[in-house]
């Protein structure tokens, strides 16, 4: 399947801990290199705790902060890319469906041509309930 190079991309990542913390920098770099309109939304309701420092992509200065916010601010600052974060656990299907709903973009400021963004859902969570939620969303979208 081919997509036009100017078609926008939205990546929604659930989980910013052990897996998401290491996936996020690669997603940021990929979106930055693609050179197309992109949105990256990181979702996690957890905070950085001392036990996370040994195995997750956080430093002591991050302690007590929301994991999604830390990653969004760290990499968007470095790469100059606007990023959104949701400092909550996504536990209900309507909330997830709202996040993955493709938005319509105007492709060029002087054109009436519009297109919907491609949406990628990354499940970087460590619990089966959220994995099942992603499965439900996949079949309903």
Language-model regions, residue ranges each:
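Adenine nucleotide-associated cytosolic modules
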Residues: 1-141
């Amino acid at each position: 399947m081919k997509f036009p190079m100017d078609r926008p991309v939205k990546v929604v990542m659930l989980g910013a801990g052990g897996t998401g913390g290491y996936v996020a920098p690669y997603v940021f770099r990929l979106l930055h290199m693609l050179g197309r309109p992109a949105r990256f939304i990181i979702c996690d309701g957890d905070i950085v705790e001392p036990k996370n420092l040994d195995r997750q992509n956080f430093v002591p200065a991050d302690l007590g902060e929301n994991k999604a916010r830390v990653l969004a601010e760290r990499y968007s600052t470095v790469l100059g890319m606007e990023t959104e974060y949701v400092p909550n656990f996504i536990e209900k299907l309507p909330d997830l469906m709202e996040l993955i709903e493709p938005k319509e973009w105007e492709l060029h400021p002087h054109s009436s041509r519009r297109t919907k963004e491609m949406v990628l859902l990354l499940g970087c969570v460590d619990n089966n309930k959220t994995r099942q939620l992603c499965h439900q969303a996949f079949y309903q979208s």
